[in-house]
C-alpha cells in the first residue's frame, strides 16, 4: 500500500473521527457553560469547536464517495456525545437543589446530614398518598451530589428525593460547609 492510498483509506477517516469526537465533546461542554451562565467560556469553546467542525466537515465534503470518511464523521459524533456527558460529570459545575420527602420524623436524618456539612431547610406538607410529610430542601454543590446520594441510598433507602439544577445563587450565601481539611483534599482530587 503506497502512502497516498494509506492516507485516503486510513489516515483521513481517523482524523475525521478524532476531530468529530473532540467537536461533539466541546459542544457538550459549551452547552453546560451556557446553561450555567458562563458566556465568555462558552464563546471561547464555541470558537474552537467551530474550527474543528469546519475542518472535519470539509474533509468529508471533499469526497462524498469515501464511505469511511462519512462513517468516521457519524461515529465520531456519537462517541463525542458520550464523551461530552462524561466530561460534564467530571467538571460538575454549579449547584443542584435536592428535595428529600419523608412521611416520618426527619430529625435524625437532618442531624446526620448537618454533621456532614449539608445545610437544609425543612417544611411540612401533605402528600396525596401518604398524608403528612416533611420536605427538606438542600442546595448542594454538584461535586458533592454523589457523596450525598450514596449516604441517602445506604442509610435511608426508602427516602424519596428529587434533584434539579440551579442556575444562580445569591453571592455570599452560606449553603454548604466544608471543613478546611476536606477543602484542601478536594483541591488535590482526594
From Swiss-Prot:
GO terms for cellular component: plasma membrane. It comes from Methanoregula boonei (strain DSM 21154 / JCM 14090 / 6A8). Its main location: membrane. Pfam families: DUF2179 (PF10035), DUF5698 (PF18955). HAMAP family: UPF0316. InterPro entries: DUF2179 (IPR019264), DUF5698 (IPR044035), UPF0316 (IPR022930). Belongs to the UPF0316 family. It is found in: Cell membrane. The chain crosses the membrane at residues 3-23, 41-61, 67-87. It is a multi-pass membrane protein. This is UPF0316 protein Mboo_0605. Keywords: Cell membrane, Membrane, Transmembrane, Transmembrane helix.
